[in-house]
Amino acid sequence: MATPRALNKAIFTPTLYQSIRDLWFSGLPWGAKSPTEEATQRWFTGSKEAKAAFDKLCHHHLNPAITSISPSNFPIKGLTDAEIAAPFVAEIEVAEDGGDAEAKTKIALSFMILLDQIPRNLYRTKETLPLVYGHYDPIAVSLARHIISMPVGSSSTRWDLFPGIRHSLPYRQWFYIPLMHSEKLADHKAFINILEELKEETREDKEIAGFVENIENFENIHVKIVERFGRYPHRNNCLGREPTSEELEWLEGGGEKFGVSG
């Protein structure tokens, strides 16, 4: 049976995990109910110049970590979800900086950002996007599936449900974005179920409810595409997939590309 390679202990350290969070959440208090305008621009709405500057920061601080789990250094072909996620789960479980639930949650969150988001900051071209879709996304979604399948009980806390961020969507959302990026409908259904549970929990808090609604609307855009085509047509070109006539017509008619060119 194939097994994943271990993470490079010289790279994957508490210092790395802290630097990921410092970079991604700069200026945003732990547990915040709403993102700051600065954070929103950093993640979603920044200008072309601002995105380029942030990409440069990501490359400077995190490229060694991303490269250390590249296809050649961390091959995943033939591995199950559990096997792919195993090295990351093991690293979270040891939690060198204390080992409590909050420490584990923070490391898990750092991994979700590193695996799902940072490759998108480093690899934006047609030539490099296949690395995102074909390698880093499968790793990210494998870890996300593991996390949401963890048992919830009095003796343990599922990392995405840690009380400090349970009602903090600016933090908690990153555990689930890999499900949104997935082309498997089951992942989208899992995300929608989580959002429904969160809506029920927070319906009395208008600040949180509004943010949940925004995420839900964005997920609905994604899931409708996967329901219709079984995949994201805007990825066809860079992945060398032959588009269907329906996909071509849809894309030419303004179908969603989520900011991806080529």
What residue spans do the PLM features occupy?
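Intrinsically disordered, low-complexity activation-like regions
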Residues: 1-262
